[in-house]
Amino acid sequence: MTFQCIQDPYQLLQDIGASPRLIQHVKLVGEAAEMLILQFQNLSISFDLDWVRLGVIFHDAGKILHPSELIEKGNEHEAAGEMMLLAQGVDPLIARCCRSHGQWQTMECSFEELVVALADHLWKGKRNTDLENKVITKAATMCHQDYWDIFVVLDGGFEEVAAGGDLRISRSVGFNNL
């Protein structure tokens, strides 16, 4: 399945039953992802921007089947989301982000998958040192620079994204229906 514009994947989510709350969530994660994308572009890191954007939109698709996981911790949505997207004809590499965004510690993940996972943490102001270190390590390798040189730049950037977490959370409050 190919998408002609950014609204197409949102429409697919709605067509398969995504609630307004889930749509708002992926849009807020998308805001964090766009900030990360800009930071990586400023470092001249070459990666698949469209994949990241699609991954962000689809990463929690399984919460359509497990709506309680929109408000409670849980991971049943991960495999369910991947299967649901595959059934809709979504590229398997993109559908995989339903699992990799939550299982990045135990899966071999691409840079793009790690960016989706990181955006899913930072959107709400939550930092994750292990995940950030994985992203920085891959970024340093990709742009052929020293880890610590990249760390200094990206750590500040990650903090900037996280600093907007309270505002993004406040914008999700009105979407209480599952």
Language-model segment annotations:
Residues M1-F3, V26:
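Conserved N-terminal diphosphate/IPP-binding helix and adjacent helical/loop segment
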Residues G17, R21-Q41:
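A positional/architectural concept
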